[in-house]
Amino acid sequence: MISGSATASHGRVLLPSQRERRPVSTGSNILRFRETVPRQFSLMMVTKATAKYMGTKMREEKLSEMIEEKVKEATEVCEAEEMSEECRVAWDEVEEVSQARADLRIKLKLLNQDPLESFCQENPETDECRIYED
């Protein structure tokens, strides 16, 4: 039985080929091939909710850590007086960081593209986004 091997951490699939094995990038989806009849393959799609890019994963982890820190700060500030202005500001900060993390998750699900592409759409004049034609 021939089957494609996949590495889930990078979202890549190696196609079952005798001559060459090329990785195929699939984003957050992992494709697997399974031999049903000799030389005929059926395609199965397995979804996985992991970030495709290391920087995106690190950003989400940092936002999660910030939320935990802000919650601790807010509970400390609100211990003395729950109705104070400082208490409201502290919980507003928690809400803002939580919203930033939620926005990142929504953006990842909707766009599911290279972060450089969205950056270049917003900043086409930067050096990272220049396109050279031969």
Swiss-Prot record:
GO cellular component, one term: chloroplast
Chloroplast recorded as keyword: yes
Region entry Disordered, spans: 1-21
Keywords: Calvin cycle, Chloroplast, Copper, Disulfide bond, Nickel, Plastid, Transit peptide
Tissue specificity comment: Mostly expressed, at low levels, in stems and, to a lesser extent, in leaves and roots.
UniProt GO molecular function: copper ion binding; nickel cation binding
Reported modifications of this chain: Contains two disulfide bonds; only the oxidized protein, with two disulfide bonds, is active in complex formation. The C-terminal disulfide is involved in the interaction with GAPDH and the N-terminal disulfide mediates the binding of PRK with this binary complex.
Span of chain positions assigned to the transit peptide in the UniProt entry: 1-42
Example GO biological process: cellular response to anoxia
Keyword Translocase applies: no
InterPro entries reported for this sequence: CP12-like (IPR039314), CP12_dom (IPR003823)
Disulfide partners: C78-C87, C120-C129
Compartment(s) of residence: Plastid, Chloroplast
Upregulation: Insensitive to light/darkness. Slightly repressed by heat. Induced by anaerobic treatment.
Pfam families xrefs: CP12
Family: Belongs to the CP12 family.
Subunit structure: Monomer. Component of a complex that contains two dimers of PRK, two tetramers of GAPDH and CP12. CP12 associates with GAPDH, causing its conformation to change. This GAPDH/CP12 complex binds PRK to form a half-complex (one unit). This unit probably dimerizes due partially to interactions between the enzymes of each unit.
Additional free-text comment from the UniProt record: Binds copper and nickel ions. Copper ions catalyze the oxidation of reduced thiol groups and thus promote formation of the disulfide bonds required for linker activity.
Main function: Acts as a linker essential in the assembly of a core complex of PRK/GAPDH. Coordinates the reversible inactivation of chloroplast enzymes GAPDH and PRK during darkness in photosynthetic tissues.
Protein name, entry field: Calvin cycle protein CP12-3, chloroplastic
Organism: Arabidopsis thaliana (Mouse-ear cress)
